[in-house]
Amino acid sequence: MKKSRKYATLDSDKIAKISLALATPDDVESWSHGEVTKPETINYKSYKPERGGLFDEIIFGPMIDYRCPICGHKYKKINEGSFCSKTELCKQEKVEILPKISRRNHMGHIKLNSPVVHFWFFKVDHSIIFKLLDLTVAGRPNTEPVRRIDLENLIYYKSHIVLESGGIKALPKNLIIDINVAAVIYKDALEELITRFEPGTEDYEDIRETLDNLIEKASSKIGQDYGIDFYELNEVIEHYSEAKIGTGAQAIEYLLKNLDLQKEKELVSAKIKKINDEEIMSGAKIASTSRQTREKLYKRLQVINAFIESKQEPTSMLIYNLPVIPADLRPLIQLDGGRHSTSDINELYRRVIIRNNRLKQWQEKDAPTLVIQNELRMIQEAVDALIDNARRSPNPVLSKDNRPFKSISDALTGKKGRFRQNLLGKRVDYSGRSVIVVGPNLKMHQCGIPREMAAKLFEPWIIHRLIEKEVATTIKNAKKMLEDQNPVIWPHIAEVIKGRLVLLNRAPTLHRLSIQAFEPVLVRGKAIRLHPLVCTPFNADFDGDQMAVHVPISERALLESRELMLANKNILGTKDGEPIINPSQDMILGIYYLTIEEPGALGEGRIFDNYEHMIRAYEAKKVSLHARVALPIEEVKNSKIKAFASRESQRYIISTVGKFIFNNIFPKSFPFIFDNKVTEATSLEQYSEKVNKYIIPAGTNVIEHIKMELPVLDAFNKKNIAKIIRYVFDKYVAALTLQDVAGVIDQLNDVPLSNIVLNYLNLKTYDDRKVDQEHAIILAALTRSATEKTKARSQRHIEGLEVPLNAEEKAEILDDVWFRYTNMVASILDDIKDLGFKYSSLSGITFAISDILETDKKPEYIAEGDAYIAQLKQYYNDGLISDDDRYSLTIKKWTDIKAKVQGELQQIIKENPRNPIITMINSGARGNISNYVQLAGMRGLMANNTKSTRADVKNERVVRSTVEIPVKSSFIEGLTAFEFYSSTHGTRKGATDTALNTAKSGYLTRRLVDVAQNIVVRKENCGSDYGHIVRDIVDTKNGQIIVPLKERIIGRYANKPIIGEKTKQELAKRNTLITDKLAQKIIDEGVKEVEIRSVLGCNTKNGVCKMCFGKDLATNRVVNIGEAVGIIAAQSIGEPGTQLTMRVFHTGGVAGAEDITGGFPRLIELIDAHEQPWGRPAVISPYEGEIVEDLVEDKNVNSHLLTIKVVNSKKETVNKKVHVYTTKKLRVKVGDHVKVGQKLSEGPVIVKELLELTDTITVQNYLLKEIQKIYRIQGIAISDKYIEIIIRQMMSKIVIHDPGDSKFFAGAIVDIFDYQEENATLLSQRKRPAFGKVVIKGAKQVPLLSDSFLAAASYQETSKILVHAAISSRSDSLSGLKENIIVGKKIPAGTALYPFESHSKYDIRPSIDYFRKPELETSDSEFIPVDLESYHQELEDEQQQIIEVDDSDISVEDEENDFYENED
């Protein structure tokens, strides 16, 4: 692809890796184009940059293209890179001729007159410098750690440090002398020093005098208030001994220069070994102080190792030359009225330059030490503020309006920083946005684009066409026609957009279906038209939502959009593999109305000879839509269908007019659907067998047959239609690949059209089965019609010649056939949508107040409740029950009463199915029973303010999350003032919960994406034999099945042969894909657990293999290599997060384990692996054995002392005691056998504790079960494999305890795969392997431990990541997706992961390639986008004026960024 030199001097596709290291002073000088010596920016009169200042044109490049900054001579583009020689000064300065864009990449530097410590290296991550140096503070015991304030005092010249002790015991090396204890230390040092000299000598007297002065000053008020003069004492000590005391950056420089890293490493390793040995000796229990010390030593060792391995000098952490970033990255903008607005960074640079210059003057004048010291401190502060002003709390440098200046670090971090604002989400050209409105007449793959918008989006193509068709003569002319919206252009625009696609995106982009491709259709008005069925995946509605439009430009982008992103191909949702495109609301209402059966309706029992005749009778109002009539079977379905096959001659099929109309939209080969039993059938064949009674031979009395034999069937509701759509999808979704169809079309010149069906029948489907006869017939018909169309267009029939088809014509036929074949499901869905809208209008459903039917039994129920509550109060007053009991019973009673009222209303609903409101509820179009109960029955109990609940849980009190006085009125009766007030709290809570939830859920998705972003399907089979045993996920508390076994094994591969329980026969071999049928067979055979291949046991590094992942739920086929399953997993878990409740409590009742926490807070708790879950954690058993006794120790405190009979390693039986302090129910009783890690009491398990006691498999199963439970309770189905991916990432790190002979060091956190590789190498060389333990890391920490520092830095804690990457000189090999987006490469997934599998969904080629000779095929380099730049260049040349940059471009990520104010 041609890249303009102006923008991309470095081709991003050629970047192989990115390394980060510490910049040495020489590096900074080599980057620099000159030294900045003056703090001036521009001249206030001439507005020209000052020479030697922060905007100097000689250093940073010219303000105007190709103009010499000294003499002002303007050159041509061709002179770029040469030197100006117009004047002597130009020759002397060697001024290069450059474009003004060079001001964005030319750097300068400031030569500092004294080194400065880089702020990040002593502030970030508890200070790298001090981890390296290991300092002590005077006047404190050695064990006490050095506090950050001590270090800052040293760097900011407030305290001093001993650099060399010179043999003086009072001054040990590396001792920090704080001003408060300085007098004592210096006194001791001088007293020690004086003993070295004979009394009476001059030196002795000198020291004596200094000592007396010190004692006098230290005891005076001034000395006590302000401390003593360090400098004078330092001079004396340094004069009379070898000691050396320093302060500030120079002292740090001295220490770093003289540091022996190798020796330090050995010392630290020895200390760690000592603690580890102690731990082994004492039997795995060591004091917490030792453990903390070891943690500190681990961290120190990590830093020392980083410097040793990267071979960098520690002094590089000091700044000698300060780089000045390019001028255009910190611009000075002229405002109206001659004022200027400047970037904060300029202000910070100016402070540094002013102070640096002043220091130079002081040094030249030989000023007093104190003055120079003060200036040095100010420079240090100025450079700190420039690097990271926000961290300089509590006193960052403030601007005039009292806000902290934005420093260089602030430009990197946070949502508005470089990473997230400019690198991961950019504003893009060729995009726009507008409000959406419904487009009911669109096909599913279309969307309506406003004419004016299309004119702007497709401008270059339109201009090209206008000139080609000679409508306009020049580009300028064409552009003017577009701007004036000349009516001539509209037909041309319509032609231009033919065959092009647009991408529509609705923020927040929660999953991949939030961006889909559509064919644009021009519409009038200013709103985008959206197909009603794609609202579900976009989560859009038409109450003012906006959507963004993007135009794919290159040929390749168009191909991908058409094959992978077109809306009609995205029928299934990714999270559960069920159709996400389901009709709703009016469409459901229409179909429900259409399929109602009414006994005795007008025209019942009539027999029609064909379908058209029936429709005419209905239109003439001779027969009702709901009347049951008969039609000949051939009119309705292919009589070849098994269920209808019979010897008898003429047979009729009985159903209502509406159901005939409904069934007419399906292909003739689809079974006739009579009733809603279709949802109970496991397959269409099974359903078809049950419908024989609706088929009668000729001559039967139809009216009698209907009355006697046929029950009145229910109409189709939302669930039935969803199931029917699933059947349609399974039956008609494309079973062949584009390559297969192309192969048949390639033979069109050799095979007669009538025989083409045989060629299709010979093909194999993608899962290696024979092609279904029906698909072959459909494809043959489509091929025939497309071929005839193409031949007719080329006018062959006129000459009567039989000319063979050429490659272009074959490609045209292929495009037509393939589109119509893959569009079959969508076209049926479109027909369902049209029917739904049509008949919901015809049904004329409306409702009035009289339609809300009430129950007359309600007052007696209310009275019963009131009497019961009064009695409870009496009992409580008499002291018979506690307040907690009274509350719980009250809540229970009112809940029961509401249930009774609901029961009465349900009866009413049954009796009045044709009531409009009840029709809406029954059909599933809108509303549900609980809405109706509030409308006509009673509103019931309301949620309480739950501020105090947490305390209640901790104190084991009953949680009062519900107001105990219910709202007794319904909306139809109207609420009293108190009831209205009471209900406002609950209502508002609902609204605030939703808002909070959206933000939290967005943040969760972002974290999960970061956890799993580099997981891509990379191999066919990793060969792992480590399976995962699955069985029903059962809630151990109430025995409910949360996820049945069948659902867990469909679409997975078996890891071991599966043997039936009943027949004992082998049902499936190892590595067999478990299909729906096979799964049903396994369940029928009574198999209770199956070992499957799982992501958790996959051996693929940075990814998974096809076998361990199984079926791709979105396509219902085995996953393809290149699928970015990590991101799909994150989206599938995050997207439904919004629907999880924020409620921590279920309604009322005693706080059991179930009530403590569910929903969103619990999910976060599991995914972040919290150490302190909400409420009181469960006690888990540390032993395996039998419980022999349970002593309740104290009556007041519920504490159990369990005794467990354990068989130890020596085969002896011993009794172990376990304390269970809790009021929660015990999970076990005497005589139970308990396993290690089993819960002894109710409550959430602390995951880290479980991992310590058991193994990884137990923890993985626990997490999987708990996460599934949260979603399933809310009725959200998510596939296991997605949760497995996240769990695998959480448990992918190992902490090294004993490094053996490996390259790791103790305390390092390494990736499991690196650990295994290293150990395999060591064992093969007969060396000692490393030993470590798996650790569990929450989703917050996993991305920070990523191998890629770019991915980690763009997530959180940017400065910390970059500091560690720099000291260890890390390289980023750009293996994940995020890193590649940052550097602007294609992501290594999908179509960019070469070579992709042939016949996979990513094997996308232009149609013409299937019919060309291989050498003529389109190569990758030919996928060049339209050269849009040449248009822009011509325009620029014509207009010769500055085109203002318009900020109305849309960024894909912008929208969601604003949607979720993220929490970091």
From Swiss-Prot:
Binding, Zn(2+): C1022, C1098, C1105, C1108
InterPro entries: DNA-dir_RpoC_beta_prime (IPR045867), DNA-dir_RpoC_beta_prime_bact (IPR012754), RNA_pol_asu (IPR000722), RNA_pol_N (IPR006592), RNA_pol_Rpb1_1 (IPR007080), RNA_pol_Rpb1_3 (IPR007066), RNA_pol_Rpb1_3_sf (IPR042102), RNA_pol_Rpb1_4 (IPR007083)
Subunit structure: The RNAP catalytic core consists of 2 alpha, 1 beta, 1 beta' and 1 omega subunit. When a sigma factor is associated with the core the holoenzyme is formed, which can initiate transcription.
EC number: 2.7.7.6
Protein family: Belongs to the RNA polymerase beta' chain family.
GO BP annotations listed: DNA-templated transcription
One of the Pfam families matching this protein, by short name: RNA_pol_Rpb1_1
Alphabetically ordered keywords of this record: DNA-directed RNA polymerase, Magnesium, Metal-binding, Nucleotidyltransferase, Transcription, Transferase, Zinc
Gene: rpoC
Cofactor(s) the protein needs: Mg(2+); Zn(2+)
Sites where the protein binds Mg(2+): D541, D543, D545
Top EC group: transferase
Residues covered by region (Disordered): 1435-1464
Task performed by this protein: DNA-dependent RNA polymerase catalyzes the transcription of DNA into RNA using the four ribonucleoside triphosphates as substrates.
Catalytic activity: RNA(n) + a ribonucleoside 5'-triphosphate = RNA(n+1) + diphosphate
Cofactor binding, per record: Binds 1 Mg(2+) ion per subunit. Binds 1 Zn(2+) ion per subunit; 2 are expected compared to other organisms.
One GO molecular-function entry: DNA binding
Protein name: DNA-directed RNA polymerase subunit beta'
